[in-house]
Amino acid sequence: MTRYIFVTGGVVSSLGKGIASASLAAILEARGLKVTMLKLDPYINVDPGTMSPFQHGEVFVTHDGAETDLDLGHYERFIRTTMTQNNNFTTGRVYEHVLRKERRGDYLGATIQVIPHITDEIKRRIIKGAGDADVALVEIGGTVGDIESQPFLEAIRQLRFEVGARRAMLMHLTLVPYIATAGETKTKPTQHSVKELRSIGLQPDVLVCRSDHPIDVSSRRKIAQFTNVEERAVIALEDADTIYKIPGILHSQGLDDFVVERFGLQCGGADLSEWDKVVDAKLNPEHEVTIAMVGKYMELLDAYKSLIEAMSHAGITNRTKVNLRYIDSEDIENQGTGLLEGVDAILVPGGFGLRGVEGKITAVQFARENKVPYLGICLGMQVAVIEFARNVLGWKDANSTEFDRTSAHAVVGLITEWEDATGAVETRTESSDLGGTMRLGAQECQLEAGSLVHDCYTKDVIVERHRHRYEVNNNLLPQLIEAGLKISGRSGDGALVEVVEAPDHPWFVACQFHPEFTSTPRDGHPLFSGFVKAALAQHQKNS
């Protein structure tokens, strides 16, 4: 019988509901409970797949191929449960489903309304997403008071009433600001945020109070009195020097004990030793490297959230401080490769569109010719193939049909047919919709024995997640191979190029998949770990 913890946020956005929720989930998992998490997004887009990275940040891809909110990445990094398409849904997805049922006549002529039809669909999806977990944490996006969030808040109010207080509770994150001129933290914004919640029938059971200063006992007592929340359930969550400290901070204040007692759960104590090791390795590195990350969305680093975290995990695995030097690929186009001088390795991540592509190609050339360790991901692999074709094969017009459909040497082109994770055949054309039409989700990849990538994984077959609609053109592959390009990974059916390596280079690996989506702080990821090891070797060589 699943218990539900609904998580809301107030006062301001970006308080870290996802991190706080995932940290609590990690503690409950460490106590032996089966835990899952859901993210409910109030925007009207069906999913974030076509949203600008500058507005939404990263699109996290699940094992089963859903394009989801970046918070699902936090969830998978903190708990062992693999997220699916059922763990994230939007207002747009809910309305799309309800309207489709209305068109079919499923409602038998009833007037379709927010209550009960939309709220019932939200509740149905929450219950389905929770599955058979002992505890499901359900995060509602946005801030209490937003018009967009109202159907979700009403739905959780109803569900909380239907399952009862022993199976549902509400955790509310608020901001307790520090006023420097007064020299104290202020509780009034939290009081008003809870007042807003209570006006719609929701009484929080737990308050997590975010602040950049310590919150004293008297302030916590005052918050408890004015919000009708138990004092021990008013949790102070001050800014930490690493997010992986948060499970320990919440546990030290007894949040998991409160949840377990409230739900009447039978479980053991929390063993957070794995998290202690992560924090120790993160804060006490023995080495240091500088890696250039060349992308086009550098104004909003959340666009690369999982990748940045994966590099941090690789640093933890190697007890190495990884300094990422963020370089806009357009700056390389305008200022040259001097921006890359002195780095220990170069990373080119995925992306879409023509802007900044030539800068990425220049970065690849710099890495290949100067023997600097290189890791290319998704588009980072495609530009590696383009660069090789231009500067080794001599095809100066080599390109991708994404950027130039008239190129005589289109070494990268649209995938028109492939098998998805279930074995079903997918087909696409240039006129297909952008939303939900890419090669998505987990796919098998066969690795070439003796290759750099095989040395990293130490496996013949791996499974990694994809999000792309362009691939290496097999028609021109023989010439690329003859010129020395190494194909060290292919799709399970052998039809698509998945990994390439450059000849006569200490460490040059480019992959079509997104390994960052499966990296975790406790386990790291073999490819990123190998990349950081190569950067360490380069650093020692340059020292």
UniProtKB/Swiss-Prot annotation:
Positions of the catalytic residues: 378, 514, 516
One GO cellular component term noted in the UniProt record for this chain: cytosol
Gene3D superfamilies for this protein: 3.40.50.880, P-loop containing nucleotide triphosphate hydrolases
Domain of life assignment: Bacteria
PROSITE patterns: GATASE_TYPE_1
Pfam family, one: CTP_synth_N
Chain sites annotated for binding ATP: 14-19, 71
Chain sites annotated for binding UTP: 13, 186-191, 222
Chain positions covered by the region annotation Amidoligase domain: 1-265
Activity modulation: Allosterically activated by GTP, when glutamine is the substrate; GTP has no effect on the reaction when ammonia is the substrate. The allosteric effector GTP functions by stabilizing the protein conformation that binds the tetrahedral intermediate(s) formed during glutamine hydrolysis. Inhibited by the product CTP, via allosteric rather than competitive inhibition.
Positions annotated to bind Mg(2+): 71, 139
Glutamine amidotransferase type-1 domain location: 290-541
Enzymatic reactions: UTP + L-glutamine + ATP + H2O = CTP + L-glutamate + ADP + phosphate + 2 H(+); L-glutamine + H2O = L-glutamate + NH4(+); UTP + NH4(+) + ATP = CTP + ADP + phosphate + 2 H(+)
Gene Ontology MF term list: ATP binding; CTP synthase activity; glutaminase activity; identical protein binding; metal ion binding
GO BP field: 'de novo' CTP biosynthetic process; pyrimidine nucleobase biosynthetic process
Biochemical pathway: Pyrimidine metabolism; CTP biosynthesis via de novo pathway; CTP from UDP: step 2/2
Binding site for L-glutamine: 351, 379-382, 402, 469
Family per similarity comment: Belongs to the CTP synthase family.
UniProt miscellaneous comment: CTPSs have evolved a hybrid strategy for distinguishing between UTP and CTP. The overlapping regions of the product feedback inhibitory and substrate sites recognize a common feature in both compounds, the triphosphate moiety. To differentiate isosteric substrate and product pyrimidine rings, an additional pocket far from the expected kinase/ligase catalytic site, specifically recognizes the cytosine and ribose portions of the product inhibitor.
Name of the protein this chain belongs to: CTP synthase
